[in-house]
């Protein structure tokens, strides 16, 4: 079904460009969800129904929704960051060129030993399920890249936790040690307020 392949591919490219070019971060996440849905359509065309379902359940149902909640909850000043990048155009261009060169090298090295065919699908053994084929390859030939990917995700999780633990002005925090050290002598304050003064002369620690 070449028409569906080109349809899903075109929609993925358009939605990916919208993810990068959208000024509103919430819209970027919505376009990212749309790209994941079209990617699952490609997986179905290739006969990998398990991967298509995992792409919907994990990426759309968990990761993309998590991105949406994080962006809406954290106070991210994207406009301020964009203005800082505009003040340093040389640095921005240099970083962009490095990332572009990195992508070119990855594409060239990744497609060096691949023999393309006119057929858009590939042969899958009928007696082997998607999960068995993925597990056999993932935990044998790609064992080290799989562990490295897990380590990268672990570092990203630590970074997210660090972002949420930043100190904010005006937020009252508990002092557990001070609360536990209270006794009956310092927990209750006995005082005798002056007439017509109320509690103005009372000092609290």
Curated annotation (Swiss-Prot):
<keyword id="KW-0812">Transmembrane</keyword>
<comment type="function">
    <text>NDH-1 shuttles electrons from NADH, via FMN and iron-sulfur (Fe-S) centers, to quinones in the respiratory chain. Couples the redox reaction to proton translocation (for every two electrons transferred, four hydrogen ions are translocated across the cytoplasmic membrane), and thus conserves the redox energy in a proton gradient.</text>
</comment>
<feature type="transmembrane region" description="Helical">
    <location>
        <begin position="54"/>
        <end position="74"/>
    </location>
</feature>
<dbReference type="GO" id="GO:0008137">
    <property type="term" value="F:NADH dehydrogenase (ubiquinone) activity"/>
</dbReference>
<feature type="transmembrane region" description="Helical">
    <location>
        <begin position="89"/>
        <end position="109"/>
    </location>
</feature>
<feature type="transmembrane region" description="Helical">
    <location>
        <begin position="142"/>
        <end position="162"/>
    </location>
</feature>
<keyword id="KW-1003">Cell membrane</keyword>
<protein>
    <recommendedName>
        <fullName>NADH-quinone oxidoreductase subunit J</fullName>
        <ecNumber>7.1.1.-</ecNumber>
    </recommendedName>
</protein>
<dbReference type="Pfam" id="PF00499">
    <property type="entry name" value="Oxidored_q3"/>
</dbReference>
<dbReference type="InterPro" id="IPR042106">
    <property type="entry name" value="Nuo/plastoQ_OxRdtase_6_NuoJ"/>
</dbReference>
<keyword id="KW-0472">Membrane</keyword>
<comment type="similarity">
    <text>Belongs to the complex I subunit 6 family.</text>
</comment>
<feature type="transmembrane region" description="Helical">
    <location>
        <begin position="1"/>
        <end position="21"/>
    </location>
</feature>
<keyword id="KW-0520">NAD</keyword>
<dbReference type="GO" id="GO:0005886">
    <property type="term" value="C:plasma membrane"/>
</dbReference>
<dbReference type="InterPro" id="IPR001457">
    <property type="entry name" value="NADH_UbQ/plastoQ_OxRdtase_su6"/>
</dbReference>
<dbReference type="GO" id="GO:0048038">
    <property type="term" value="F:quinone binding"/>
</dbReference>
<keyword id="KW-0874">Quinone</keyword>
<keyword id="KW-1278">Translocase</keyword>
<keyword id="KW-1133">Transmembrane helix</keyword>
<feature type="transmembrane region" description="Helical">
    <location>
        <begin position="26"/>
        <end position="46"/>
    </location>
</feature>
């Amino acid at each position: 079904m070449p028409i569906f392949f080109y349809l899903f591919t075109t929609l993925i490219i358009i939605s990916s460009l919208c993810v990068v070019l959208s000024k509103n971060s919430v819209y970027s996440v919505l376009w990212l969800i749309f790209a994941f849905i079209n990617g699952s359509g490609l997986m179905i065309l290739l006969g990998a129904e398990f991967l298509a379902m995992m792409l919907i359940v994990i990426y759309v149902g968990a990761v993309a929704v998590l991105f949406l909640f994080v962006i809406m909850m954290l106070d991210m000043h994207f406009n301020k960051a964009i203005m800082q990048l505009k003040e340093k155009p040389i640095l921005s261009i240099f970083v962009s060129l490095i990332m572009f060169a990195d992508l070119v090298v990855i594409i060239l090295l990744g497609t060096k030993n691949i023999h393309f065919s006119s057929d858009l699908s590939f042969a899958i053994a009928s007696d082997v399920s998607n999960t068995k084929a993925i597990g056999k390859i993932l935990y044998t030939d790609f064992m080290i890249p799989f562990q490295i990917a897990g380590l990268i995700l672990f570092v990203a999780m630590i970074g997210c936790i660090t972002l949420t633990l930043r100190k904010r002005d005006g937020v009252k925090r508990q002092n557990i040690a001070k609360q536990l050290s209270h006794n009956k002598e310092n927990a209750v304050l006995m005082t005798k307020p002056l007439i017509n003064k109320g509690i103005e002369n009372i000092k609290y620690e």
